[in-house]
Amino acid sequence: MAKATTIKIKLLSTADTGFFYVTTKNSRTMTDKMTKTKYDPVARKHVEFKEAKIK
């Protein structure tokens, strides 16, 4: 079987609340680290989320 092109990643909050989203990305087209602005319900505001490895 061929290697999958999409991988699961964890988007970790930069507000240091420990909250994270799990999403997928195409590792062939998006080689750099992903950052997104999303809602953090613990901090109760929109913050930047950065990519981290799922353990």
Curated annotation (Swiss-Prot):
PROSITE patterns: RIBOSOMAL_L33 (PS00582). Keywords: Ribonucleoprotein, Ribosomal protein. Gene3D superfamilies: Ribosomal protein L33. GO terms for biological process: translation. InterPro entries: Ribosomal_bL33, Ribosomal_bL33_CS, Ribosomal_bL33_sf, Ribosomal_zn-bd. Coiled coil: none annotated. GO terms for molecular function: structural constituent of ribosome. One of its GO terms (cellular component) is cytosolic large ribosomal subunit. Belongs to the bacterial ribosomal protein bL33 family. PANTHER family: 54S RIBOSOMAL PROTEIN L39, MITOCHONDRIAL, LARGE RIBOSOMAL SUBUNIT PROTEIN BL33M. This is Large ribosomal subunit protein bL33. The gene is rpmG.
